[in-house]
């Protein structure tokens, strides 16, 4: 008796669902069969194409789908290379022979030739206070007798970066800074006799941080490196890639792997570095060009799942070093070493090595400064930014990786539909069956429109759709965007 009473109580619910199904059926038959079928036949699309096609030839009019656009984002690393004391060093190679080093307000020129300027004297640092007019023979990174305090640390850092080991390798000659001839340090890298292994090691270090330099010394001949202060050339521009090579060369330890141990909490920051809740905004930190959107916790969640994305590497790099850069000019040079170790642990990994191999093999690679993503204009959702590859020192044209951003658009739409499906299933799990059923009815009722219909646009046979451009008989764009290709054209119904 109790079960029967429960069944009778549920009858109004069943009747209500049946009534809803009847209303949906009437709506599909009366409205969808009249208006949607006309839309699906292609007549309206053809009229719109003939009226609007060729009106604009700008790149901004290209769309992947109905609501997805191809966009890009560029990063600037100028915050890492500011003109302050104890900043990250900058390196420059001019005319493949002139080597330069700059950090803060100090800059140096590195000459490599066979001319001997300094000679060794039987005086060490302990007696330099008594004899300040002779050259100094040093075995440690303490170069206070050779350079000023703001120059000493960067010169010692550079010497260590090219492969010199203070506790094992031969000492260096430097001119006493009290002499009027000027500051100078001399390193013997002659690849002869007992100095051959030391010379080869320093040569390889120079080749690593100064890519493309010409070797002025030959096997068995005398070869000396001379470092002296000199103004920074005007034709040398800041290049973060050279700084990355320098930091990776001078690292003391290498992280074998890199994974996120916990979910990162990101926050908005203003130009002064003050935090505000709501996500992580690169634009407010002046690392992304203006008028671009902020990437919030959605992008960071994707970075926690995908560990091989160059864009995620850049986010981690900025997060790890934001506080270190802020205190870089206020603390001692030990802070710079900590910063270099942190950066090296992030960039000296398999991903950077893979990109460097691609560069050497003339294969497109990533330089971590420009990224592209697919943005859904209605919902505001976007895909995880991906690196814009480089070949022969120039960015690839967007048409060269067209398939990638089209697939990225498909993945974004699929992700949005899957999320919407999960939300609807959680809200109305019973009605979901009805929606699927009537979706099948809708599909079967409009299937015949695929057999008869109007073409919607014209494009080159076998090529991609040129929307919103209109083609002429020679396969070129009527507005002059593309040159005539002398290829046959064909009318299509859908893009």
From Swiss-Prot:
Protein residues bound to Zn(2+) 2: 457, 459, 465, 495
Residues modified by glycosylation: 95, 188, 367, 375, 392, 397
Superkingdom as given in the UniProt entry: Viruses
Transmembrane residue ranges: 18-33, 435-455
Residue ranges annotated as Cytoplasmic topological domain: 34-58, 456-495
Site location (Cleavage): 58-59, 261-262
GO cellular component term of the entry, any: viral envelope
Keyword NAD annotated: no
S-S pairs: 92-236, 281-294, 303-312, 366-387
Keywords: Disulfide bond, Fusion of virus membrane with host endosomal membrane, Fusion of virus membrane with host membrane, Glycoprotein, Host cell membrane, Host endoplasmic reticulum, Host Golgi apparatus, Host membrane, Host-virus interaction, Lipoprotein, Membrane, Metal-binding, Myristate, Transmembrane, Transmembrane helix, Viral attachment to host cell, Viral envelope protein, Viral penetration into host cytoplasm, Virion, Virus endocytosis by host, Virus entry into host cell, Zinc
Extracellular membrane side: 2-17, 59-434
Ligand binding (Zn(2+) 1): 57, 469, 477, 479
Record site: Important for GP-C-mediated membrane fusion: 33
GO terms assigned for molecular function: metal ion binding
Coiled-coil ranges from the UniProt annotation: none
BP term (GO), one: fusion of virus membrane with host endosome membrane
Pfam family, any one: Arena_glycoprot
Family, per entry: Belongs to the arenaviridae GPC protein family.
UniProt name for this protein: Pre-glycoprotein polyprotein GP complex
Source organism (scientific name): Tacaribe virus (strain Franze-Fernandez)
